[in-house]
């Protein structure tokens, strides 16, 4: 202990507060100046030398100051380099040569070579994980072949990765040109030209025009996806050498009637120039593929090139060698940089191993600085500070936890107990880095990020909060440029922004060149179905662990409590990063996402943030190129910097991915919407961006369910991969669709093409022997690839099996995107006619299946003729068969007169017979499951039991995330009774067979007595004292910012505003807000008034002149919502009437199928079980009654009460009881 105290005293000696110290310090606006030399301009945009900076630090760190002087923050300017204190030593944050106090992988800093004399830059094989596109202008004295390819300016595609020998490398690929197409006849007519040379001159004139030249010089044309090294030289320098024009013959993708035609293929040396010309050269002329960036061109135009995987360097076509860049010309933080051309690269497609990439798992803690310290911090407020950042560093190759860093504003002592526990778990001891000011902490974090240079970063909600807070803070408060803190030293993309906001949710993206951000919050919301997605709830469900929580409102007091108390915050911060790291290696999201990137040939960042449309588009683009088709341009949609339109359109689709492999999801049903809005109908991407998923066709057919409780076996047939198989079987595609029979001249109906009635329109699709569907080819190849991958899994090592499983999952994801790709009006290549045809065929298949079953197996004799084995499966009931439900890709068939075991055994043969007799390959029905008992409620809502007693449910309230545990517990208990108890099941079947109105005047079957006892138990529990608030917590997602809601009178919004009113930590968008419903007390009424005023929904009661007292106005349920923590801490009474009514409502919606789907009748019948609340007679009145000779009644015993309830339920008089 003494040694520790001595170490602490040494550590504290370096801390400096400029407000009480004697070093040079200048307050803003004081008129003082510092006698310092002006620093030379930095060679790179990341900080390497800082002589003064804005000093902001909390006053609570002035531990010897009086208490009344320890609130708020110090703000000023400090004249000295940024410092960091670690283990009793002081370091200069930006002095690379001093060694530093955090791990570093970078070996070239500020143009200086720290690689060592023995460093060998040679390598042959290297792995790529990210790709960045830049522009470069070559100097006139550079004679290399690479300068010729970038003169006057050219695009460079940089492959970032690691060599097989462990060097961090950047391979700059020159000679990749941007190109697009224009119809020759249209161009010649518009420009009055006939030759390629004339077109070149016309484009040069376009670039030279005064207004456009200025725009070109300002970079308002084309696309920049990463760094922008080399600058830009303006439109005036554009010459004929910048362009290359060829006349080629192609066919446009849309419609069978399109014929091969001549097109000008215009290529430019840089994507900026090419994009500018595509946008501004005769905008009325239709362009093709102009929005395709040069990165995509590199990957698609070269065989087997991949966005994520291995390459080998080799001599070029004519023996050209790669060029090693000298250190002084490095533009990234890589160890080695190479110049090459595409022919110097040889992909290695079969190599699946990963190099030793590093993962940074981080978390930030913030604190409000002035006013109310309990308020939630805002990054743009200079007083709201980042006080701690935890960084845990892992090896992706070994999954080893290698380092733990804690950046702390002010002194911070991690307890010895916590450090020892880390060592005991096999984790490194935390290294604490302490800072005097927030600027120094943030600059140190960014410098560490640059110097350690991890390839991957993760955390929990880092996209919406951590990254966003850091970026906004350093740019708005400290004016730090971030373009040099990714892999590129200057001009790199380092940005967080919102990509879409619609009526459902808000989505953000973060793009940092050379750093892939994988947010585990997004992974959790996609993989799990939980009432809450707070980190504690997720790790509890996935890992079986629970975090030690530190409420936000306690952070200010802990932070002001000294180094030990700040250490508690540090342990909490480290704990969050550690748990997220465990989640990461549980789900391994990088493996699945990288497999998608490889298959779709797009970068990993685009896979994460740019939606599903781009995945199909690039695959279709490659196949179209091979088949001599060209794709119409959809500017501002393919571009990753302007995805808002297609992203917004995909929000609904992302959450409703179509069923592809039903074996992975036992109860999965194709998630296609049943109904469609009347959205945009144009098929060229027209319509306003950001207006949601606009479709203009009817959804899939649903055969109305025969609601009720079915105790005879019900077999469920599923169409395997329904929509992909329809596209394949019927050869559906852009290229096979004909809108007019004139285009089909010489072709025979049914033989050469099929006709479909879609709404009031006839659509024609030619068969594969006439023209093969490109979409069908993609699906066929992907399915074959997935089958081959899955076949390798059983014989692979565990490590290989994980990679293969992620690969087959990636193929499944892309296959499921194809139908949605055509059906989104604001997508990259919309064709609503294809999507409408798919759903039309799906409807017809359902109807054909129903009619086939009802005719082919109508009698027992017909069934046994088709399936002789059915003879042995008879039971005592008369035979019948009926399709009781059909939903998109599922058919429910009820058999009476056959045993459950028999139907289960015959199911596969039945599905095969239907597939063979009715459908084209690869469409096929599969026997998915057989229900022993099935409560079929309405469309998409059912509960049943299959073989082995497993319960399956879909769409019922019991599995909804927003129900409280009290309701879920009793609702589930009642469902268990219905499905597993013979007496209750028999009674339920009897109830279903009788018209529901009859049960109002007659007793329920006696088998329902167990059902009633559960309801009585629930009533007694809800009316008992000392309720556990946790059992009554409900949740709802904050899907968008509160001000974006049209209806603000929602329970979770009420709680949001109450938290704001009390200056509590506010939930983030997409976070689930917990709430309970409280009793209407005077306090609840007061707070409801305040909340309604805050959200602009206040209602002033109408005042009337009357002598009578006004009745108490009943508040809306939403006004009575309250934060569960506040209820527990303040003993606020719950609204028990609401909860029991909610329970009755929930189970009535579930069990209404027993009573003809009449909710009112169901609820009234269930209320028979509820004991009546006795009327309490006032004491004075009771005394008068006794004196008058009335006998005093004593309360019933519980046993008598139960007897009377059951008598009421099962011995009801024939006349209906009077309802008050």
Swiss-Prot record:
Transmembrane segments: none annotated. Its main location: host cell. It catalyses: DNA(n) + a 2'-deoxyribonucleoside 5'-triphosphate = DNA(n+1) + diphosphate; Endonucleolytic cleavage to 5'-phosphomonoester. It comes from the Viruses. One of its GO terms (cellular component) is host cell nucleus. Signal peptide: none annotated. The keyword Acetylation does not apply. It is found in: Host nucleus. Its EC number is 2.7.7.7, 3.1.26.4. Keywords: DNA replication, DNA-binding, DNA-directed DNA polymerase, Endonuclease, Host nucleus, Hydrolase, Multifunctional enzyme, Nuclease, Nucleotidyltransferase, Transferase, Viral DNA replication. InterPro entries: DNA-dir_DNA_pol_B, DNA-dir_DNA_pol_B_CS, DNA-dir_DNA_pol_B_exonuc, DNA-dir_DNA_pol_B_multi_dom, DNA/RNA_pol_sf, DNA_pol_B_thumb, DNA_pol_palm_dom_sf, DNA_pol_type-B. Residues 646-660 have a biased composition (Polar residues). Forms a complex with the ssDNA-binding protein, the DNA polymerase processivity factor, and the alkaline exonuclease. Interacts with the helicase-primase complex composed of the primase, the helicase and the primase-associated factor; this interaction may coordinate leading and lagging strand DNA synthesis at the replication fork. Belongs to the DNA polymerase type-B family. This is DNA polymerase catalytic subunit.
């Amino acid at each position: 202990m003494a040694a520790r105290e001595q170490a602490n005293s040494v550590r504290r000696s370096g801390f400096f507060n400029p407000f009480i110290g004697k070093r040079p310090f200048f307050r803003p606006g004081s008129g003082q100046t510092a006698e310092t030399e002006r620093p030379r301009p930095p060679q790179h945009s990341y900080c390497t030398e800082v002589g003064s900076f804005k000093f902001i630090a909390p006053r609570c760190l002035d531990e010897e100051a009086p208490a009344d002087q320890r609130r708020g923050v110090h703000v000023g300017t400090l004249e000295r380099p940024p410092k960091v204190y670690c283990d009793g030593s002081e370091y200069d944050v930006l002095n690379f040569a001093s060694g530093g106090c955090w791990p570093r992988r970078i070996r070239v800093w500020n143009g200086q070579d720290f690689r060592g004399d023995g460093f060998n830059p040679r390598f042959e094989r290297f792995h790529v994980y990210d790709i960045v596109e830049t522009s470069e202008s070559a100097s006139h004295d550079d004679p290399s072949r690479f300068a010729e390819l970038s003169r006057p300016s050219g695009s460079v595609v940089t492959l970032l990765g690691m060599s097989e020998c462990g060097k961090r490398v950047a391979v700059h690929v020159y000679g990749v040109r941007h190109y697009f197409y224009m119809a020759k006849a249209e161009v010649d007519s518009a420009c009055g030209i006939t030759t390629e040379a004339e077109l070149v001159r016309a484009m040069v004139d376009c670039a030279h025009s005064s207004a456009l030249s200025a725009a070109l010089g300002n970079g308002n044309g084309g696309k920049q996806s990463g760094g922008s090294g080399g600058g830009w030289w303006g439109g005036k320098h554009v010459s004929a050498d910048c362009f290359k024009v060829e006349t080629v013959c192609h066919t446009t993708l849309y419609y069978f009637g399109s014929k091969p035609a001549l097109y000008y293929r215009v290529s430019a040396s840089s994507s900026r120039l090419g994009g500018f010309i595509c946008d501004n050269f005769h905008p009325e002329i239709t362009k093709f593929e102009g929005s395709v960036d040069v990165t995509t061109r590199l990957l698609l135009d070269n065989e087997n090139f991949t966005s994520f995987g291995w390459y080998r360097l080799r001599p070029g076509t004519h023996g050209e060698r790669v060029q090693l860049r000298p250190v002084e010309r490095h533009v990234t933080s890589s160890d080695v940089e190479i110049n090459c051309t595409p022919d110097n690269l040889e992909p290695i497609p079969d190599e699946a191993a990963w190099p030793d990439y590093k993962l940074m798992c981080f978390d930030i803690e913030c604190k409000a600085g002035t006013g109310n310290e309990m308020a939630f911090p805002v990054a743009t407020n200079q007083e709201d500070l980042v006080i701690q950042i935890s960084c845990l560093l892992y090896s992706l190759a070994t999954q080893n936890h290698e380092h733990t860093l804690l950046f702390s504003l002010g002194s911070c002592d991690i307890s010895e107990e916590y450090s020892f526990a880390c060592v005991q778990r096999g984790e490194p001891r935390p290294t604490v880095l302490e800072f005097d000011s927030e600027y120094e902490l943030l600059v140190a974090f960014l410098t560490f990020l640059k110097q350690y240079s991890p390839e991957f970063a993760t955390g929990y909600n880092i996209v919406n909060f951590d990254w966003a807070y850091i970026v906004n803070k350093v740019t708005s408060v400290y004016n730090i440029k971030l373009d040099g803190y990714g892999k590129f030293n200057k001009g790199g993309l380092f940005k967080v922004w919102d990509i879409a906001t619609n009526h459902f949710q808000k989505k953000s993206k973060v793009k940092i060149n050379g750093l892939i951000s994988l947010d585990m919050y997004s992974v959790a919301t996609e993989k799990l179905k939980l009432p809450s997605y707070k980190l504690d709830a997720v790790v509890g469900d996935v890992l079986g662990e629970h975090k030690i929580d530190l409420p936000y409102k306690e952070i200010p007091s802990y932070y002001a409590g000294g180094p030990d108390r700040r250490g508690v915050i540090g342990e909490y911060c480290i704990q969050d990063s550690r748990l997220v790291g465990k989640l990461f290696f549980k789900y391994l999201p990088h493996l699945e996402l990288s497999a998608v990137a490889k298959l779709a040939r797009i970068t990993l960042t685009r896979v994460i943030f740019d939606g599903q449309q781009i995945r199909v588009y690039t695959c279709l683009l490659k196949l179209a190129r091979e088949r001599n088709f060209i794709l119409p341009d959809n500017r501002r949609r393919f571009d990753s910097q302007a995805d808002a339109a297609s992203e917004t359109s995909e929000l609904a689709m992302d959450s409703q991915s179509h069923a592809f492999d039903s074996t992975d999801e036992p109860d999965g049903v194709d998630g296609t919407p049943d109904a469609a809005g009347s959205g945009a109908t144009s098929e060229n991407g027209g319509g306003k961006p950001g207006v949601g998923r606009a479709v203009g066709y009817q959804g899939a057919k649903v055969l109305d369910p025969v609601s009720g409780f079915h105790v005879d076996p019900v077999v469920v047939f599923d169409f395997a991969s329904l929509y992909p198989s329809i596209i394949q079987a019927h050869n559906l595609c852009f290229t096979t669709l004909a809108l007019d029979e004139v285009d089909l001249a010489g072709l025979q109906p049914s033989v050469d093409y099929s006709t479909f009635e879609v709404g009031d329109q006839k659509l024609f699709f030619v068969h594969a022997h006439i023209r093969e569907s490109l979409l069908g080819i993609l699906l066929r190849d992907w399915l074959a690839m997935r089958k081959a991958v899955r076949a390798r899994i059983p014989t692979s090592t565990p490590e290989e099996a994980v990679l293969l499983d992620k690969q087959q999952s990636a193929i499944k994801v892309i296959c499921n995107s194809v139908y949605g790709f055509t059906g989104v009006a604001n997508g990259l290549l919309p064709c609503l006619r294809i999507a409408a045809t798919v759903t039309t065929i799906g409807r017809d298949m359902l109807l054909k299946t129903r009619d086939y079953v009802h005719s082919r197996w109508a009698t027992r004799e017909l069934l046994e003729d088709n399936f002789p084995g059915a003879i042995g499966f008879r039971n005592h009931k008369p035979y019948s068969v009926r399709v009781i439900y059909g939903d998109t890709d599922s058919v429910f068939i009820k058999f009476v007169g056959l045993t459950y075991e028999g139907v289960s055994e015959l199911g596969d043969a039945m599905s095969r017979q239907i597939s063979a007799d009715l459908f084209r390959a690869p469409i096929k029905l599969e026997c998915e499951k057989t229900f022993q008992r099935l409560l079929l409620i309405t469309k998409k809502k059912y509960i049943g039991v299959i073989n082995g007693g497993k319960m399956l449910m879909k769409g019922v309230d019991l599995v909804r995330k927003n129900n409280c545990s009290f309701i879920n517990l009793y609702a589930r208990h009642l469902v268990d009774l219905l499905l597993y108890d013979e007496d209750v099941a028999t009674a339920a079947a009897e109830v279903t067979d009788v018209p529901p109105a009859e049960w109002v005047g007659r007793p329920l079957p006696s088998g329902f007595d167990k059902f009633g006892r559960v309801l009585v138990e629930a009533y007694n529990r809800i009316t008992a004292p000392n309720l556990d608030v946790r059992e009554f917590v409900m949740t709802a997602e904050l899907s968008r910012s509160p001000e974006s809601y049209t209806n603000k009178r929602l329970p979770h919004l009420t709680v949001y505003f109450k938290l704001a009113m009390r200056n509590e930590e506010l939930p983030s968008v997409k976070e689930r807000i917990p709430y309970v419903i409280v009793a209407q007390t005077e306090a609840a009424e007061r707070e409801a008034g305040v909340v309604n005023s805050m959200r602009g929904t206040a209602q002033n009661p109408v005042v009337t002149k009357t002598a009578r007292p006004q009745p108490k106005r009943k508040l809306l349920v939403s006004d009575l919502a309250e934060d569960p923590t506040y209820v527990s801490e303040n003993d606020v009474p719950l609204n028990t009437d609401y909860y029991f009514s909610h329970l009755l409502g929930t189970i009535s919606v579930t069990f209404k199928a027993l009573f003809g789907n009449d909710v009112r009748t169901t609820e009234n019948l269930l209320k028979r079980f509820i004991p009546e609340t006795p009327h309490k007679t006032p004491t004075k009145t009771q005394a008068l009654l006794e004196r008058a000779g009335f006998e005093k009644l004593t309360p019933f015993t519980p046993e008598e009460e139960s007897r009377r309830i059951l008598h009421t339920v099962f011995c009801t008089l024939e006349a209906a009881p009077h309802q008050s």
